[in-house]
Each structure stands twice: as C-alpha cells, then as structure tokens.
Swiss-Prot record:
Listed name of the protein: Pyrroloquinoline-quinone synthase
Family: Belongs to the PqqC family.
Gene symbol of the encoding locus: pqqC
Function according to Swiss-Prot or TrEMBL: Ring cyclization and eight-electron oxidation of 3a-(2-amino-2-carboxyethyl)-4,5-dioxo-4,5,6,7,8,9-hexahydroquinoline-7,9-dicarboxylic-acid to PQQ.
Organism: Cereibacter sphaeroides (strain ATCC 17025 / ATH 2.4.3) (Rhodobacter sphaeroides)
Pathway assignment: Cofactor biosynthesis; pyrroloquinoline quinone biosynthesis
Length: 255
C-alpha cells in the first residue's frame, strides 16, 4: 500500500514523439488503472455487504470533494487565460453553480441512499488515514510539480468511462439499495470524463516537446494511478480483511 511520490519510468521505446508518448500513456492505463483492483471486482460483482459499500462511498467522498480543490490549484498554475477558462468548467462540474447541482451533490445522493448521515460524510472524520494521505498527496502534486505534470495527472480520465459504465450496470444488477437516481454521478461522468480527457491529452501532446517532458507526463499518470490504487488497497485491508484502524468508520455489519 506504498505511495511512491516520485515514480520513475524506463520506457521500452524512446519517447521521441507525441504518438510514442500517447501509446505509453495508454499502456500505463491498461496495466495500472484501478479498474483492475480486486476491491472494484468485488464492488461491481455484488460481493460486498451494504456496510462495505458504505465504507467505499464514505471514503470516496473525500476524493470527490477534493477534486475541485485540486482543479482550483491547477488553474492557479497558469498565466494564460485560455487554459484557465478551459479548466474552469471542472469546478462547476463538481461544485455545481447557483441553481444547479454538481458532482459532489450527486455523490451525497449516493451516501444518503446508503443510510450514511450527511453531516458525518461531509465532516470526513471517519475516513481511513490512507485515503486522506493519498488524496492530499494528489492536491500537493498538482501544486508542487510543473503545470504540465499537473494536467498530465488528470489523464486517468482517459480510462474512466469504462469503469463508470461497469459500475452502473454491476451495482444496479446486484444491490437492491441502488437505483438509477443513486447512480446519477457516474451517469453524468460518462459524458464529462471524455471531454476532460480529450483536452488534457491534446495539451500534453502539444506541450511535452522533449523526451524528458514526455517521460514526466507518463510519470504523472503513474503517480495518479498510485493515488487511486492506494485508496482501494486501504479499503480492502480495512473492510474486506477486517483491519479497520482506530477512529475510522465501522459499519453495523462489522460491529
């Protein structure tokens, strides 16, 4: 469950072009994206208890509510107006705007339906330590690394539509406490994630001009996959293997 904050990449082929970099990015996603994690296989296959699904949704909320914080930091890294304008819609996608709901609102619909107290969810007091450390590391990464790497770290969205579709169909099929309204967050991301990923990919293809910069882009994606994988490692250790750390949420069916 280690989190490597400075991953290194030794590509099998030289990153001597944007196409070579994109091929490598897609290889990284195929090998490292968290759709391969055993916890997701359990979740989508209907093999978790209601309490385990509660634990997943509670911990994932910290990631969801931190995404607009991360995006605000990304915006602050750029002097050019065009990039800031392009990135700004991501804040509204998650935070919402006056009179419209955002992704955080839709995630709270899910936690409400699972029977979690909304104040408890929003306080994030019951999340796993590894969840907090991994998500905070992501926010710090986009703050501390280059603007190019900040954008590149978002490229996991290239692989997100598949897992969202799998989650929608799997959870609707297997859990009687889930319905289409509850899954609205994932339904919306089916259209939002490809749009965001397309822009980020175009950006890194244009702005990563040297083999070193292309390697940095690939390393940023590796880092982000580690952030996602670490969260699931922690959930599996705590709620499947039963090693819940002190102070973390304990579902009723584990008490």
């Amino acid at each position: 469950m280690s989190l490597d904050l400075t991953p290194t990449l030794s590509p099998a082929r030289p990153l001597d072009s944007a196409d070579a970099m994109e091929d490598r990015l897609r290889e990284i996603g195929a090998a490292r994206y968290h759709d391969r994690h055993p916890f997701h296989h359990l979740l989508h296959g209907g093999q978790l208890t209601r309490g385990q699904v509660q634990a997943w949704a509670l911990n994932r909320y910290y990631y969801q509510c931190s995404i607009p914080v991360k995006d605000a930091v990304v915006i602050s890294r750029f002097r050019d107006r065009a990039t800031r304008v392009e990135w700004r819609h991501r804040l509204e996608d998650h935070d919402g705007a006056e009179g419209t709901e955002g992704g955080i609102d839709r995630w709270l619909v899910l936690t409400d339906a699972l029977g979690l107290d909304r104040d408890y969810v929003e306080a994030t007091d019951g999340i796993l330590p590894a969840t907090r450390f991994a998500v905070d590391a992501y926010v710090h990464f986009v703050r501390d690394q280059s603007p190019l790497e900040a954008i590149a770290s978002c490229l996991t969205e290239l692989f997100a539509p598949h897992i969202h579709a799998e989650r929608i169909s799997g959870m609707l099929a297997h859990y009687d406490f889930v319905n289409p309204t509850v899954m609205a967050y994932f339904q919306r991301r089916l259209s939002q994630a490809p749009r965001d990923a397309d822009y980020a990919l175009r950006y890194v293809r244009e702005h990563a001009r040297t083999p070193q910069e292309r390697a940095a882009v690939c390393n940023a994606l590796i880092f982000k996959t580690q952030v996602l994988w670490t969260q699931l490692d922690a959930l599996h250790h705590a709620y499947v293997l039963g090693h819940v750390p002190p102070g973390a949420f304990v579902p009723e069916d584990m008490r």
